[in-house]
Amino acid sequence: MKTLVLVAVLGLASLYLLSYASEVQQISRDEEDFRALMASFGGIFDTEERGVDKEGCRKMFGDCWGDGDCCLHLGCKTRKLPPWTDKPYCAWDWTFGRK
């Protein structure tokens, strides 16, 4: 009787280990499928620096000589709104989204 109980417990333990191992393999397969799915979207979910469209562009309140000097969604303003400036500066040009 004791031997039968011992064999049953060992059998259940081995079944538990086998099912756990197959579950771990299934999770790793699911992770690979998820990564492949995310890669197929072509970078939609990649983060990118907002508002910078070219190397060396002027950021908010930076000096400028024309709209081409400022970063995306910024324009060169000549009005002296900030009291500390006496020359043109880059400020928001009231646009949204991508140009």
From Swiss-Prot:
Q: Which Pfam families match?
A: Toxin_12 (PF07740)
Major location, coarse class?
A: secreted
Residue ranges listed under propeptide: 22-50
Tissue and organ distribution: Expressed by the venom gland.
Q: Where in the cell is it found?
A: Secreted
Record's signal peptide: 1-21
Matches recorded under SUPFAM superfamilies: omega toxin-like
The UniProt function text for this chain reads: Ion channel inhibitor.
What's written under domain?
A: The presence of a 'disulfide through disulfide knot' structurally defines this protein as a knottin.
> What are the annotated disulfide bridges?
C57-C71, C64-C76, C70-C90
Biological source species: Trittame loki (Brush-footed trapdoor spider)
Q: Does the keyword Signal apply?
A: yes
Is Nuclease set as a keyword in this record?
no
The record's family statement is: Belongs to the neurotoxin 10 (Hwtx-1) family. 25 (ICK4) subfamily.
The molecule here is called: U11-barytoxin-Tl1a
An example of a Gene Ontology cellular component annotation for this protein is: extracellular region
Q: What InterPro entries would the database entry show?
A: Huwentoxin-1
**Keywords of this protein's UniProt record, alphabetized?**
Disulfide bond, Ion channel impairing toxin, Knottin, Secreted, Signal, Toxin
Looking at the UniProt entry, the stretches that span the membrane are none
What Gene Ontology terms describe what this protein does at the molecular function level? ion channel inhibitor activity; toxin activity
